[in-house]
């Protein structure tokens, strides 16, 4: 929505053709919100595990809007279980939706990004932290997210000569999303969260500049561009000092 307010053309590609009972919304409702915010929108029903469908989606997006400038790898699966308690089916799911999808989507978007004067790939994954605690409590999930970051490191170097910027972005704190309320706590968890707006503002700042090969935290990005007051990002102003630091950050 942050980009939409600047008049951007936005493609919403996901499996949610109908509102999800736990996640809420659909690709169509999000498209309506993008248009209401001032942008143009195209909703595409897509499973990022299907490489043929991804290639078709990229072609459809490029034909509809005349090209692709920015790819945001935002699809994600979460499983907060250790090796002993993670079924293989769940393991395969989180690997395929997280780091494999970054490979598939980035590769499919590459021919179009090479033609752009402002090509960007931004993946939502953390800086790599080898503190054993993150490799113990939920190693399969950690592997999938670190895989996204490692791939981004490689692509930043590989695509440099094409003028394509490749970076990652991760929240410094819990963000009030369904992933938090469904997997970490409950509806009361929003009291220790920030609003998604901070990630949107940070992402917009990243794609508005030409740095590459960086692994950003949302607050750090905004501080780098002069933001000093973060209180308005708190979901509950009364508990702004109790906001929880996110996974993978010591």
Locate predicted features.
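Substrate-binding pocket helix/loop in short-chain dehydrogenase/reductase
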Residues: 82-83, 87-92
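The beta1-alpha1 cofactor-binding region of Rossmann-like NAD(H)/NADP(H)-dependent oxidoreductases
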Residues: 25, 45-58, 88
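Catalytic loop of short-chain dehydrogenase/reductase
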Residues: 114, 119-161, 172-175
């Amino acid at each position: 929505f942050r980009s939409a307010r600047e008049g951007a053309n936005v493609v919403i590609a996901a499996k949610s053709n109908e509102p999800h009972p736990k996640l809420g919304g659909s690709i169509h409702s999000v498209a309506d919100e993008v248009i209401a915010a001032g942008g143009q929108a195209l909703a595409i029903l897509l499973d990022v595990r299907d490489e043929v469908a991804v290639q078709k989606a990229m072609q459809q997006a490029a034909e509809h809007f005349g090209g692709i400038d920015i790819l945001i790898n935002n699809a994600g699966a979460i499983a907060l279980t250790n090796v002993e308690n993670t079924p293989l089916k769940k393991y395969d799911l989180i690997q395929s939706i997280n780091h494999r999808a970054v490979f598939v989507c980035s590769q499919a978007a590459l021919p179009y990004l090479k033609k752009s004067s402002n090509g960007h790939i931004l993946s939502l994954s953390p800086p790599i932290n080898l503190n054993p605690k993150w490799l113990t409590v939920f190693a399969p999930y950690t592997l999938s997210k670190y895989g996204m970051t490692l791939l981004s490191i490689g692509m930043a170097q590989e695509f440099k000569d094409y003028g394509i910027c490749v970076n990652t972005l991760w929240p410094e704190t819990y963000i009030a999303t369904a992933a938090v309320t469904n997997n970490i706590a409950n509806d009361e968890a929003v009291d220790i969260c920030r609003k998604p707006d901070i990630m949107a503002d940070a992402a917009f700042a990243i794609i508005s500049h030409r740095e590459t090969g960086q692994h950003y935290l949302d607050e750090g990005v905004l501080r780098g561009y002069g933001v000093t007051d973060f209180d308005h990002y708190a979901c509950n102003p009364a508990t702004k000092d109790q906001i929880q630091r996110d996974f993978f950050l010591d």
